[in-house]
Amino acid sequence: MFGLGLADVILERFKDFMREQPEPYKFLQVFYAQEKERFLNHKMSDYIKQNKSKEEASILARQGFVSAVGRALEKIIELLLKDFCIKNNVKMTNDKILRAKRINGELDRVKRALWVHFGEYSVLPDIILYQTNKDNIKILAILSVKNSFRERFTETPYWKLKLLQSPVTSHIKVFMITPDNDDEISFKDKPKG
């Protein structure tokens, strides 16, 4: 795995995890916990070797994990959706691809259909599912992938509100995907009533 970024290393480990779990998407939190422990132990050791205090090493290691795991989660979701897309003649792309300096005409049309501007900033959704028919592009759904619900819980409804403003985009489905690592939206017990 030499030369791979951390998100790619985590993705490769998830592929191994998939071979062990028949329904790996149900065990994302288990996988996440394993990766977090592995990463924190390794990084803390590195920071302590650099003469950082244990407390500072812990803070730095956690910050590094949060930034890396977000992109890894997007790659894992893309991997889990790959077969679905192939079976249903659906194409998938993401904001990283669409931000490249050189993209083909099809991807440029996808980008132009979804790009939202906030003053000097432009925003694209994490993952986009779409279909093509000759020169026509139909965007089916956007996926907002968040490692933590707390992270940007307002972003997903914002996308839907923006899309509803135009008859051209009002049909697009919007989904938020999160392992809910902070237990912000999970219900451990069934509600009484």
From Swiss-Prot:
One function term, GO molecular function aspect: endonuclease activity
Do you know which Pfam families this protein is assigned to? RE_BsaWI
Instruction: Respond yes or no to whether keyword Transmembrane helix is given for this record.
Output: no
Q: What class of enzyme is it?
A: hydrolase
> Which stretch is the leader sequence?
none
**What EC number(s) does this enzyme carry?**
3.1.21.4
**Keywords (A to Z) from UniProt:** Endonuclease, Hydrolase, Nuclease, Restriction system
Q: Does the keyword NAD apply?
A: no
Give the reaction(s) catalysed. Endonucleolytic cleavage of DNA to give specific double-stranded fragments with terminal 5'-phosphates
- What GO biological process terms does the UniProt entry carry, in alphabetical order? DNA restriction-modification system
Give the function comment from the record.
A P subtype probable restriction enzyme that recognizes the double-stranded sequence CCGG; the cleavage site is unknown.
Q: Which family does it belong to?
A: Belongs to the BsaWI type II restriction endonuclease family.
**Name listed for the protein in its UniProt record:** Probable type II restriction enzyme HpyAORF263P
